Every structure is written in structure tokens, then in C-alpha cells.
Amino acid sequence: MDILLKQIDSNYPHGKAKEATQQVLANLRKEVVEGTRQTAFDQAEILSLVQKQLEEKEFSLRRVINGTGTVIHTNLGRSLLSAKTQEQLLATSFHYSNLELDLENGKRGSRYSHLVSIVKKLTGAEDVLVVNNNAAAVLLVLSSLTKETEVLVSRGELVEIGGAFRIPDVITSSGGTIAEVGTTNKTHLTDYEKALTEETGAILKVHTSNYRIVGFTETPALTDLAELAHANNLPLINDLGSGLLLDMRPFGLPYEPTVKEVLDQGCDVVTFSGDKLLGGPQAGIIVGKREYIEKMKKNQLLRALRIDKMTLSALEATLALYLDEKEALQSVPTLQMIGLSEEDCLGKAAELAAMLQPLAELSVKIEKDTSKIGGGSYPEHLLPTYAVVLSSERFTADILQEKLRFSATPIITRIKNDCNYLDLRTISLEEFPTILESLQEIFK
């Protein structure tokens, strides 16, 4: 071990070099024990592997290739940002910017003012606030508008969105009290009417985008709920979750309400995510009536939850693409991947398979498969796709998956039928050479 460490590049800290050497030796021993190692190794190869691992692990957060077919993959960073968003990030993040400076009068401005005009055009909302995620958005809204009051929520909408983030707990954390309305499968307008008291502070709608209650169900129309809320001087708050700006039905997807639609139907405040169906950075976007947004701006929580210049820049650039629907569909990677046809996926699969076919000891096939949208969106809907299917007598499916994951650029696959599936919906053409190089290294 000491002899090896002395020959490693001195630019790396001793601790990191030692850890990398131990990992390489452990991997080599494992290959020998499992019988997957067919050639002997010497000191030169060990040093090469250690050097490679040190270079790869310079940073913990790394780029990966998503071969799972899940477009909005939470574990892999959710939505990819567009090329135009990247340009805007470079322009504003590596230089000074007018983040909180009004260029017209030279005085201090608001970071949120950069989004007001574009949000008005896209949704019709009077004002906008942005915090670091939708959970924070819901917390800020309730803390600002319903503290020490009751919040009416249908029992069928008392959801958990993941990570133990539950609507009842959020209401309690924000200082309010939950008032459950109706039943799990049926809630009528009269249920809300009967639940109204002098303590009621708001009516909350939670869009169940990550699950479905089907069959014998009923829920009042938003327009009726808005009329009831406004007749009692209450705000109607809508947690829309994923947050669509475009109607996705032309792509064969089921109907989901857009932000503009729910605002037009009378909702006073709407919250949604930036990094799901919108295809932007992680953010919690709050849009709605100015009188309610102004109350949120005075909440001390806002300072703790506010977004930075990079998130703001990326979000503005993403929203700008939606001013032209055609451009959004072509330029926002999330929408582009969702919109890929079955034929497009087959064409990509054929191209990748042709590149991999010459590799010895690797079986390469093309199979019809299904992709998921992910991110808690369209839970029941699968997208038809094609996958390149890899198998080998030399490695089990689990071992091959591990080796792909340990590549210089980690490749994340899905195991099915004892094979590794690479779904072409979530793999770009530019990533094909990297996949080939990784497999050449594995099967050399």
C-alpha cells in the first residue's frame, strides 16, 4: 500500500489517495473471488485505476446518464435545463447582475420583480413569489394566510407527497388547524358549507397529481368552491403540485389542469413546482392575487426560503420559452422527452444497438418497453418506448449494472428479466459514445 501511495500524483490529498487505493484493491479482489477477472493485474494497472478513480471522484455530485426511462427522476435531479437556460445562467451567475437593483431609478429593487411580467403573460396572475420548493411554497402561503385559523380540506386530498411531507402536518406547522371535509372518495359543496365557522381562514384544494381515486367519486367544481370562498371573504388556495403551463393532451396524455385554468376558475393563490412538468430548476412558485402575495412578502419565513440568483435566472429563462408554445415543446428537455414518439425511440435504439453490437461477450437486443414521466406526475400513464437490452454470460445483470454505475460517467440502468435495459427516451444522441466507451472498458 505505501509503495503505491508514493507513486500517486502528489496533487491529491493523502487521505483521498489512500481511500481510492483501498477501493481499487477491494474491487480487484472482488473480481477475482467472483471469477469475473480473466487477466492478471500488475502495479501499473492498479496505479492507472487509482488515478482514474481520483479524477472521477473529485466531486461527489456528478453527471450521470439516465437509462431508466423515467423522465423526471427525483434521484437523478429531476428536470434537465434547456440550452437557452444554460446561456442565461452563464451570463448572470458568473458576473454581477441587477438581482435587487432597479436599473430605471438606480434604487434597491425586488428579486421577484424579474418574474412578474412574464408570469402575468403566461398565467394571468397579478403577482408572483418564488421560494426553494413547492413544500416551502405551501408552508409560506398557509403561514401567511391561515395562522391561528381553520383550513378546510377534503379528506380525499390529505396527501403525502414524499419524504413524509404531509398536508395535515404542514397546516399544523404553519400555525393553523385542519378541518377535514367530506369523505375520502366523495366531497360535496355542501360539506364545505357545513364546515364553515367564524374560525375558518381559507379553503385549500390539493391536486392529487401523484395518485388517483377512481370509481364512485365526486368533488365540487373549482368555480363553485371559489364562489363559496369569496362569498365568505375567504381565499381559495390551490396546491397544484407538478404545475402545467401547457395542455399535454395533444401528446396523448390525460387531462391535467394548467395554472392559468385554475386561476381563471377563481383560485386566489396557486402553488406549483419548478422542476417537474414545468421543466425548470427546483423552485416553489406562488402566483395569484396581489393582496395575498403582499402578505407573504411580509412573512419572516420568506427570507429563510427565498431563492438565489441562479435559480431565479434559470426559472426566468425557462418561463421565457413558454411565450412561444412551439419553442417550449422543442427546447424544454422535459417536454421534448415526453413528446418523443415511439418511432423516435426506435430509431435511437437502432443507432445505439448498432454501435454496441461489435462488442464481444455482450448480447445486444432491442425491445419494446414503457417509460414513466415521474416526479409524481401522471402516475397511471406509461409512454411507449424502445430499449436497448444488454446481457452477458460473463457478468450477472446486477454485476453489469454495478460496473456501468461505476463508469467514468455513471450509467444508470433498469434491470428486467435478468437484463439491463437502456431506455432511449431519456438518453441523448450525444451520450452514445460515452456508453460505448464505458462498455468497451468493461469488456476489454
What is each model feature region?
Residues E342, L346-S428:
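Conserved C-terminal alpha-helix-loop-beta "cap" of PLP-dependent enzymes
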Residues A26, G67-T68, R78-E104:
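Glycine-rich phosphate-binding segment of PLP-dependent enzymes
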Residues M1-K57:
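Long amphipathic alpha-helical segments
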Residues K57, R63-L80:
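N-terminal Rossmann-like NAD(P)+-binding subdomain of aldehyde/semialdehyde dehydrogenases
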Residues E291, N299-Q300, I307-L356, D369-T370, ...:
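Structural motif of enzymes handling amino- and sulfur-group chemistry
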Residues S60-L61, F272, T409-R414:
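A short linear hydrophobic-aromatic micro-motif
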Residues M1, I65-G69, L278-P281, L383, ...:
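Short Gly/Ser/Thr- and Asp/Glu-enriched loop/turn motifs at secondary-structure junctions
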Residues G106-Y322, Q357, S438:
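Conserved PLP-enzyme active-site core in the AAT-like
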